Amino acid sequence: LHSFPTRRSSDLAHPHDGAGQGLIKKIVEISRRPEFLGKIIFLENYDMQLARRLVSGVDIWMNTPTRPLEASGTSGEKALMNGVVNFSVLDGWWLEGYREGAGWALTEKRTYQNQDHQDQLDAATIYSILENEILPLYYARNRKGYSEGWVKTIKNSIAQVAPHYTMKRQLDDYYAKFYTKEAKRFKELVANNYAKA
């Protein structure tokens, strides 16, 4: 790890989101200032190919949006499907997806209304979790050169979280919650030559 925090951003703003585009422009401008060179890296032209490279090149996917402003967090879902462990605020998809032992999370609830105070607390919490939980687990190598605990966390993530974000789960939910109920209702309506219609 670097001796200073490095932020990577590859966000896209909706074409009609002028405020979002302005924010991204401001981040890029700040990242070019001498005091931030090497500390903020903005990856331009984010697309599926770049996402694939990012996902295949990391061991942990850290996403720390301001609560409750995470739109969804699909990049974390992509990472999950590729065996990457997540560390995020309990917001967006991670609010539903998080399972203890299958990744790490910052609390869902804010402690402070003042955003600066909340950011300071979140930063301290992030570093504490990184230094006291994540890094020791990651670097606890056995004689074969890998961390059994880290591999267990990856397996837990794939087994306990990933199945909830598949097309099969989505189709099963659709079938159980909508299709079967509507099919039953249809049969009732057409029975006895549409007597109940």
Predicted features and spans:
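Short hydrophobic "strand-cap" motifs at the C-terminus of beta-strands
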Residues: 10-11, 43
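Catalytic binding pocket for nucleotide-activated donors in carbohydrate/polymer assembly enzymes
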Residues: 55-164, 168-182, 186-189
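Active-site donor-binding acidic/aromatic loop of nucleotide-activated sugar
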Residues: 38-47
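Surface beta-strand/loop "capping" patches
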Residues: 190-197
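Short, conserved secondary-structure transition motifs
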Residues: 13-17, 46-53, 162
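Short, structured helix-loop element that forms part of the nucleotide-activated donor/catalytic region
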Residues: 13-36
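Structural alpha-helical scaffold elements that stabilize or flank donor/cofactor-binding regions
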Residues: 1, 53-54
